Amino acid sequence: FVKKYALEGKAEIGMHLHAWNNPPMYQLEVAQEGAPYLIEYPDDVMEAKIKFLTNLIFERTGIKPVSHRAGRWATNEKYFELLSKYGYVVDCSVTPHVDWKTSLGQTEGSCGSDYSSAKDKPYSIDTSNGSSVLEVPVTILRSHKLFLKTSSAKNLARSIWHAMKGTELWIRPNGDNLEEMKYVLDQTYVSDRDYAMFMIHSSELMPGGSPTFKDERSIEKLYKDLEALFAYASVKYEGIRLRDLSNGKESSANKRTL
């Protein structure tokens, strides 16, 4: 299904790896209740998993992936070195303003990556093998703006609390954040950032595929929000693939890329 659009330049097939169910299987010592990050595995196992999934994507689609996002957002120097080795030129795993250290891994002391001080615009990551990977961070806005949730007193209180302490706004639907996503698009457009990045898991597009969208009613609401969001975005943004960003492709006049 996706291959047709990828070949037409309307979509992109990238690589996204969750280490615990990606061959070859390898048993880590279990010391914590979190799911294991790829960066917890020995270097040779990390490489074998990346090689396996990269080859599988090519075998199934005939397309060599060059873009990547890490499972559970975790990266390190070795990870980028291996991505470069297997032909990846662009990554989108960095989540500015977000610290994942409370998201535990499986081995003793393991946790997620801390991106709280990360750049929010594209930058090059040099690797030890002399090559580089373009990092295109996820669009996340730190904000104190109050978005009133009138559906219940509980939601109203939560909105006020988030505005007081500040919160991270993503272009990531949760069933109740259409206005927030539009706000991020608007703020990004008037900033010095030349793209906005939307994200969603494919499992979230079906009833019961995630804790966020548990039934058909919530999925219908999701699709209505997506239609409204992309209609709104299309006025000031145009779609682009990560591989095109890495090649320096520019957006049309007066438009940003999404």
Model regions and ranges:
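Metal-dependent polysaccharide deacetylase catalytic core of the NodB/CE4 family, i.e.
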Residues: F1-A70, A74, S131, R142, ...
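Short, electropositive alpha-helical surface patch
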Residues: F1-L7, N76-V89, A253-L258
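Hydrophobic faces of well-ordered beta-strands that scaffold small-molecule active sites
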Residues: I13-L17, V66-H68, V90-C92, L134-V136, ...
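Short, solvent-exposed loop/turn segments at secondary-structure junctions
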Residues: A19-N22, R72-T75, T95-V98, I140-S143, ...
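Histidine/acidic-residue-rich catalytic or RNA/ligand-binding cores of hydrolases
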Residues: P24-M25, T102-T107, F147-K149, P207-K214
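The substrate-binding groove and active-site-proximal loops of carbohydrate-active enzymes
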Residues: G34-V45, K64-G71, G109-S110, G166-D176, ...
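Active-site-adjacent pocket scaffolds in enzyme catalytic domains
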Residues: A70-S191
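C-terminal domain-boundary segment and adjacent tail
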Residues: S159-L258
